[in-house]
């Protein structure tokens, strides 16, 4: 154990606190700036009115309208294009085709099935 004595670092309490203060003082301007920015530029969240109101059914309806609208149609077209390119290069498999076509059927068929089962228009 005596061989480890010469490698032992003797830190007193004052030098340890000085080292910590030197390390922390480097971050002080950033912390103060971040606190000031968050206090003085606070405002209402931009996502608080994304649901279109307080009704959860309205929020779900807005999401369904987004997915089944032009965005969903673009995704379906891109999926079919990806299958065509994969088929052209010989990389298409039955699993890939079934996954993409099945996803398209589920995405657009769920709305029709839900309206049929609930009696909606």
From Swiss-Prot:
Residues 1-19 form the signal peptide. VirB proteins are suggested to act at the bacterial surface and there play an important role in directing T-DNA transfer to plant cells. One of its GO terms (biological process) is protein secretion by the type IV secretion system. It is a multi-pass membrane protein. Keywords: Cell outer membrane, Crown gall tumor, Membrane, Plasmid, Signal, Transmembrane, Transmembrane helix. The chain crosses the membrane at residues 65-85, 94-114. The keyword Transmembrane applies. Interacts with host plant RTNLB1 protein. Its main location: membrane. GO terms for cellular component: cell outer membrane; type IV secretion system complex. It holds the Pfam family TrbC. The keyword Transmembrane applies. Belongs to the virB2 family. It is found in: Cell outer membrane. It comes from the Bacteria. This is Protein virB2.
